[in-house]
Every structure is written in C-alpha cells, then in structure tokens.
Amino acid sequence: MEPAFRGTLGGAAQSFDWPTARVDGHNVDLRQIPSVDQRQLYFFYGTEVKDGWCALTNTATGLACGLKFDPAVFRCNWLFATYGGWRNYNVAVLEPCTGYPLNFEAMRAAGRQRTLAPGESLKTEILFSVQEAITSVESIRSDGTIVQSRS
C-alpha cells in the first residue's frame, strides 16, 4: 500500500497477501476490475519479487501483457490503477521499481532505495511482451514468452 496515495484501499492493512485486501470489513479481490462508476483508486506494491516479472491479463479477451526484468535491479513493482477514481480515468499502470514507498525520504529511512556513487552507472534491460490466449500468467520466459498458468 502506498501510504501517501492510499486511494480507495485506505482502510486496508499496510501489508496484505495478493490478491485480496481486506478493506473496511470486506475482502477486495484485486484481480477483478471494478466498473468506472465505482470510482476506485489503487496504488500498491509487490515486494516479494523472485523471478523478475509482472503481468496483467484480460481474462475476457485472453490478452496478456507483461514485463521481464532483472530482480537484482528492480526489487519490487507497483500497480497504480484508477477505475474512475482519479480524474475519471480508467487505466492500470504496472511497473517494476527499484524501491518503495513513493516518498524518497521514507524510502531512504527504510533502506529501500538504490544508490549510485558519483560517476557510477547501471545498465539493465526490461522486456515488454504481449500475447494472446492467456488468462492467467505462470511466468515470463527470458525470450518474452508468457506462460499460461496450469490452474
């Protein structure tokens, strides 16, 4: 959960297990996209990145998109999603990131920032992939192939 931008998940615990957040006494399944008229706004982090990928699927159309990245560089990812809840936009943005939360001072205080020394550089790659006939993602291979979950 992004403390500075809690949105409509404001009643949820700071930390929760994907995909369910408990908000004001009821469970919110974050895999489900609410209608725009519900005016929902989410901003939260995935902090246990192991294999270096994140993905979104449209289960109705079978279209999936995902990002493959180096988990040593991008140790977490975040999802900002507004379904009419911010400026009436209907969009989801999934992105790997090097640290969290959004506020740098809080990130640094928690020891979650990446630091480059003067003159130091960092080079990495991020692979964006789109694939049809996928309703749930098991993984993303290094060549960008999105693997359908078995379940």
Residue locations for each model-derived region?
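Active-site/ligand-binding surface loops and adjacent short beta/alpha elements
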Residues: M1-F69
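Active-site pocket scaffolds in enzymes
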Residues: T59-S151
